[in-house]
Curated annotation (Swiss-Prot):
<dbReference type="GO" id="GO:0043124">
    <property type="term" value="P:negative regulation of canonical NF-kappaB signal transduction"/>
</dbReference>
<feature type="coiled-coil region">
    <location>
        <begin position="233"/>
        <end position="496"/>
    </location>
</feature>
<feature type="coiled-coil region">
    <location>
        <begin position="38"/>
        <end position="170"/>
    </location>
</feature>
<dbReference type="GO" id="GO:0008270">
    <property type="term" value="F:zinc ion binding"/>
</dbReference>
<dbReference type="InterPro" id="IPR032419">
    <property type="entry name" value="CC2-LZ_dom"/>
</dbReference>
<dbReference type="GO" id="GO:0030674">
    <property type="term" value="F:protein-macromolecule adaptor activity"/>
</dbReference>
<dbReference type="GO" id="GO:0034620">
    <property type="term" value="P:cellular response to unfolded protein"/>
</dbReference>
<keyword id="KW-0863">Zinc-finger</keyword>
<feature type="modified residue" description="Phosphoserine">
    <location>
        <position position="521"/>
    </location>
</feature>
<keyword id="KW-0479">Metal-binding</keyword>
<keyword id="KW-0968">Cytoplasmic vesicle</keyword>
<dbReference type="GO" id="GO:0048471">
    <property type="term" value="C:perinuclear region of cytoplasm"/>
</dbReference>
<feature type="zinc finger region" description="CCHC NOA-type">
    <location>
        <begin position="544"/>
        <end position="574"/>
    </location>
</feature>
<dbReference type="GO" id="GO:0005776">
    <property type="term" value="C:autophagosome"/>
</dbReference>
<feature type="region of interest" description="Interaction with Rab8">
    <location>
        <begin position="58"/>
        <end position="209"/>
    </location>
</feature>
<dbReference type="GO" id="GO:1904417">
    <property type="term" value="P:positive regulation of xenophagy"/>
</dbReference>
<dbReference type="GO" id="GO:0001920">
    <property type="term" value="P:negative regulation of receptor recycling"/>
</dbReference>
């Protein structure tokens, strides 16, 4: 083992020169001056051999780590699948528990209602609702005692009938006939007593004897009927016994199956106390299962992160391996032993041990996760047991409700019928009002649809008008531009005309002066020409003034036409 601490490792993998990498810390560095070249070569060879061995060991370790990593990844995937399966089962169990709890509550409410109705029916049977409960309880107890007495008498009669059947089958000795005679005599006496107690006028002895004979005949027929009925009851009892025996056999087979399953799940039976505690906790708070599942999901994520860290560490180890190989090649080229090789060897050993410790820690964590998954499985078994128990309770409650419903179906309450009739009337009224509302809504919807159609038509017309307006506007703008161009051309032509006229007048004056040569006449002609030129200018000014001036009232811009002025005014105002 190296005594080098964790803080001594550098980023490049080199060790410091202050402490030795391998051996005790008090050991000093060997001096190279004390060794001969032959010894140095031997040490170099030994170091090369050790480096080669370390390379092979690193390769084996890397392969083993890769295999373990693959196994861990496969195991994590299996764990994820199992956890997803357990989560789905737990969700289904929760949903079933909630549904069963709701059904149990409903059944309890129905039982309470049925109990109240039975009490009301008892009160209706008594006739007076003001009768106290003590009297009703006394009557119920009397009825119970009568029922018990009748059941005891029935059992005695069944025993007597069975004895009679056995005696008839065996041949019928004298004692049996004596018993039969005694029974017949007792029953005849009872019949005679009934005849005597029956009301009616007293007649002669012959009439009494005839009545007694008829009574005995009737009694014998009644006895035969009772015997046949008892035989039928016995047959039904035997059939019930056979059915019960079959059910017992099936129950025993199920018990054997459950015992086999219990033997198979011996490991889960050792944790029965924990299961009971968990059942109590689940009964107290069913939401703990979801929290535990979330905790397990978090643990899975942490394990996945740790696996990623292990993968990064493996990549770092491979990089370290490459660096060590490069260093070994450099050492082989130099053929000179240095203390850095010893330090690198110590670092490699330290890194290998560190990776082994990490692998051991990962194994321990995996074992912990396996234990947790086993605990979750046990929790699921407990949930299934609770689910089965709740199902049994639910079935029992359904049976009780069916029995109570059968009893109530025989005695239907008029109050309930009246309430139901009232509810039906209210429902019919509500339906009628809702149908009226629906009709009104349909009418409003039809109106709105018509309005929408008209709106669509109006929008189309608006679009057509807008397109026409834009086209007219563009045409007016073009006309305005053409008019402006024509006005400019006219102004240019007027200027050219003025210049041409001035030149012509000058030329004519010069010609006149050259022809006549007289100054006086020239002066008169000049005055005449000046007057003529002034008249021409006044005419041009009048023509220009006659052109109408269209100016904007807002910005004062002069425009040639009314259309262009209107377009400009609309744009300027907007």
């Amino acid at each position: 083992m190296s005594h080098q601490p964790l803080s001594c490792l550098t980023e490049k993998g080199d060790s410091p020169t202050e402490t030795t990498g391998n051996g005790p810390p008090t050991l000093a560095h060997p001096n190279l001056d004390t060794f001969t070249p032959h010894e140095l070569l031997q040490q170099m060879r030994e170091l090369l051999i050790e480096n080669h061995q370390l390379k092979e060991a690193m390769k084996l370790n890397n392969q083993a780590m890769k295999g373990r990593f693959e196994e861990l990844s496969a195991w994590t995937e299996k764990q994820k699948e199992e956890r997803l399966f357990f989560e789905t089962q737990s969700k289904e169990a929760k949903e079933r528990l909630t549904a069963l709890s709701l059904e149990n509550e409903k059944l309890k409410q129905e039982l309470g209602k049925l109990k109240g109705k039975t009490e009301r029916s008892f009160e209706d049977l008594t006739g007076d609702p003001r009768v106290p409960k003590a009297e009703a309880e006394q009557e119920v107890e009397q009825l119970k005692t009568q029922v018990a007495r009748l059941q005891a008498e029935k059992a005695d009669l069944l025993g007597i009938v069975s004895e009679l059947q056995l005696k008839l089958n065996s041949g019928g000795p004298s004692e049996d006939s004596f018993v039969e005679i005694r029974m017949a005599e007792g029953e005849a006496d009872a019949a005679m007593k009934e005849i005597k107690t029956s009301p009616g006028p007293i007649r002669t002895d012959s009439i009494d004897t005839s009545k007694s004979a008829e009574g005995t005949r009737n009694y014998l027929e009644f006895e035969e009927l009772t015997v046949s009925q008892l035989l039928l009851c016995l047959r039904e009892g035997n059939q019930k016994v056979e059915r019960l025996e079959i059910a017992l056999k099936e129950a025993k087979e199920r018990i054997l199956d459950f015992e086999k399953k219990a033997k198979d799940r011996s490991e889960t039976e050792t944790q029965t106390e924990e299961h009971k505690e968990q059942e109590k906790e689940e009964e107290k708070s069913p939401e703990t299962v979801g929290s535990e599942v979330e905790m397990l999901n978090l643990q899975v994520t942490t394990l996945f992160k740790e696996l990623q860290e292990a993968h990064t560490k493996l990549s770092e180890a491979e990089l370290m391996k490459k660096r060590l190989q490069e260093k070994c090649q450099a050492l082989e080229r130099k053929n000179s032993a240095t203390p850095s090789e010893l330090n690198e060897k110590q670092e490699l050993l330290y890194n290998n041990k560190k990776l082994e410790l990490q692998v051991e820690s990962m194994r321990s964590e995996i074992k912990m996760e396996q234990a947790k998954t086993e605990e979750e499985k046990s929790k699921l078994t407990t949930l299934q047991l609770t689910h089965n128990r709740l199902l049994q309770e639910y079935n029992n409650a359904l049976k009780t409700i069916e029995e109570l419903k059968r009893r109530e179906s025989e005695k239907v309450d008029k109050v309930v019928l009246q309430e139901l009739n009232g509810k039906l009337e209210m429902a019919e009224k509500a339906l009628a009002s809702k149908q009226l509302q629906m009709d009104e809504m349909k009418q409003t919807i039809a109106k709105q649809e018509k309005d929408l159609e008209t709106m669509a038509v109006l929008r189309a017309q608006m679009e057509v008008y807008c397109s026409d307006f834009h086209a007219e506007r563009a045409a007016r703008e073009k006309i305005h531009e053409e008019k402006e161009q024509l006005a400019l051309q006219l102004a240019v032509l007027l200027k050219d005309d003025n210049a041409f006229e001035e030149g012509a007048s000058r030329q004519s004056l010069m010609e006149m002066q050259s022809r006549h040569g007289a100054r006086a006449s020239d002066a008169d002609q000049q005055a005449f020409l000046v007057q003529r030129g002034a008249e021409d200018r006044n005419w041009l000014q009048q023509q220009q003034q006659n052109i109408p001036i269209h100016s904007c009232p807002k910005c004062g811009e002069v425009l040639p036409d009314i259309d262009t002025l209107l377009i400009h005014v609309t744009d300027c105002i907007i």
